[in-house]
């Protein structure tokens, strides 16, 4: 991201949304397959060029990059090719860690065993911006709770409270309130994500969780002044949408919808009730809500089961 070429690319994509077919054709001709986001919704001729390269290569690293690019292109033909490679693996598959269906997730979608496409993100994105004192917002980050964490004894927090009835949030398909509650100290030390069930009237049922090391108790690393900063932060929902990749390359941007800035790999949680992959909803950068915090909290949800997952990533 420090290279000027990367900075220019992310300025064009994240803030101006102007990666054109001409740029995509030039990238393909130069065999530039990273960053893979450059091929988002590329035209059919570019897609076919990537498919030809993918089906011709014997190099696992090149195949990995090309599958990422094809995932961001994301049309039905891209799905057909990734499904074909999942069902009939090439020799280079043995050198990769995950199947083509997991590569598809990088582009915000995947497919099931029957080849049915599953959309994992939304085609609308809103930023969280700093508001004025007392400004009302349909989205709140960091609402205090009365209950305490069973692991560290610290205060639980509603990390995200979102009212889907606001006109800006209609794209989410939520006719009520979604609440995502967790322990801000322990969420990064759990064996898997934190989960809760939500009801559209604002209710929350926090699911049991386990620490990654199997211990029952741990220290609370969030200080009282951190809780205060978190629960009194000034963020409100922005008034207008932004490009889908607005938050995908910045470490200081909180967003609803669009694409995430995954610190590690894109990771879509399976719903603990129905088993389907959850949809990406929001990202909260910890250091935007209290000092000296690291990493990002990713919020996903299952629209059918009304279950939320919260997972932490950091370098």
Tell where the protein language model's regions lie, with residue ranges:
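Preference for intrinsically disordered or flexible, low-complexity segments
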Residues: 1-315
């Amino acid at each position: 991201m420090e290279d000027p070429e990367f900075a220019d690319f992310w300025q064009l994509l994240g803030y101006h949304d102007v990666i054109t077919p001409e740029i995509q054709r030039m990238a393909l001709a130069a065999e530039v397959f990273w960053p893979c986001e450059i091929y988002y919704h590329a035209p059919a001729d570019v897609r076919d060029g990537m498919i030809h390269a993918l089906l011709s290569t014997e190099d696992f690293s090149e195949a990995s990059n090309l599958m990422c690019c094809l995932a961001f292109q994301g049309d039905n033909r891209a799905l057909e090719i990734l499904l074909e490679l999942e069902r009939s693996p090439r020799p280079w598959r043995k050198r990769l860690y995950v199947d083509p269906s997991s590569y598809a997730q990088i582009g915000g979608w995947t497919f099931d065993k029957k080849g049915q496409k599953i959309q994992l993100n939304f085609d609308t994105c809103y930023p969280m911006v700093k508001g004025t004192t007392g400004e009302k917002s349909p989205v709140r980050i960091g609402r205090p709770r009365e209950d305490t964490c069973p692991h560290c004894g610290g205060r639980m927090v509603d990390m995200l409270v979102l009212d889907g009835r606001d006109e800006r949030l209609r794209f989410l398909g939520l006719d009520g309130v979604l609440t995502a509650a967790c322990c801000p100290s322990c969420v990064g030390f759990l064996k898997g994500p934190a989960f809760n069930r939500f009801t559209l009237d604002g209710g929350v049922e926090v699911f049991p969780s386990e620490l990654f090391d199997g211990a029952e108790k741990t220290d609370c690393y969030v200080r009282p002044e951190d809780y205060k900063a978190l629960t009194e932060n000034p963020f409100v929902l922005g008034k207008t949408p932004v490009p889908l990749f607005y938050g995908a390359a910045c470490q200081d941007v909180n967003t609803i919808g669009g694409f995430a800035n995954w610190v590690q790999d894109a990771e879509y949680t399976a719903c603990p009730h129905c088993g389907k992959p959850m949809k990406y909803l929001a990202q909260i950068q910890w250091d935007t809500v209290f000092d000296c915090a690291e990493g990002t909290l990713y919020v996903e949800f299952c629209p059918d089961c009304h279950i939320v997952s919260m997972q932490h990533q950091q370098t």
